[in-house]
Amino acid sequence: MGRPRRRGRDINGVLLLDKPLGLSSNDVLQKVKRLFSANRAGHTGALDPLATGMLPICLGEATKFSQFLLDSDKRYRVVARLGQRTDTSDAEGALISEREVNVTQAQMDAALDSFRGSSQQVPSMYSALKHQGKPLYEYARQGIEVEREARSITVYELLFIRWEGNDLELEIHCSKGTYIRTIIDDLGELLGCGAHVSYLRRLQVATYPSDRMVTLEQLTAIVETAQAEERSPNAELDALLLPMDSAVLNFPEVNLLPAVAAYVKQGQPVHVAGTPGEGMVRITEGEERNFIGIGTIAEDGRVAPKRLVVEHVDGANPVVAGVAAGNTP
């Protein structure tokens, strides 16, 4: 019997992809997975095909921590087309109303100010939120309206950039779960003229730097050049990745001596002096501060592992951040 076929290589890290216009987040995810020959990949919050910009893609063990990027703040640049409302609240939808734009700067300023801070937002029917296991947009395409509960959101910053003709450009820093299309649709109705999103770009996720974004074209060029030169592109591709723990840098660090870390790697909680009183922590090991996973502070003050990094070595058993599976510290 032959050896089972490998699905891909074990590569761990976070790629900041600059998602192109016209492709879905899953489309670009699959392209990145193939280019890296990765065995596992997942994105951290979908962007509509109409949208471009930062889409963090987690490879390998980094997928264990992708949820924390889903829960992080986002920053967007958006252009709203005033005077036209569509059924999807963006340029891809059908026009459902067209009205004149008779809005003063004072009225605009007052309307924008009403969106700053915390509020309740009813998600769009054209969203990926699920109802009975099916995305809302599938119901919407069938002409079915589903009752949606309002959700708490926070707009930390809403910057007025420009207003030329019927195009209004804004920059919005917001909490997780905020639908920019819904903000623009609500703004249009508040102004009495209607509006939809004509341009949307995600500038930032959490604290990731925008200058570390790479495009599909750059990745493809690296692979094609390597193939033409009959060499592996892996080293060049891997240099573009950010560390796995970049997804959880907002958690306090608990640094363990190797002897103590060995217990954590086996799933055992440990007492560590000087830990936070509660909440999630990022666990590192030794003077090198190697990331081994995340944990929580238990009621008795011990650090309890929650998700640990598993390293894969060709021809060997999986290793939990340096300890072979099954070993006892």
From Swiss-Prot:
Substrate binds at residues 43, 76, 179, 200. It comes from the Bacteria. Pfam families: TruB-C_2 (PF09157), TruB_C_2 (PF16198), TruB_N (PF01509). Gene3D superfamilies: Pseudouridine synthase, PUA domain. InterPro entries: PsdUridine_synth_cat_dom_sf, PsdUridine_synth_N, PUA-like_sf, PUA_sf, tRNA_psdUridine_synth_TruB, tRNA_sdUridine_synth_fam1_C, TruB_C. Responsible for synthesis of pseudouridine from uracil-55 in the psi GC loop of transfer RNAs. This is tRNA pseudouridine synthase B. It comes from Yersinia enterocolitica serotype O:8 / biotype 1B (strain NCTC 13174 / 8081).
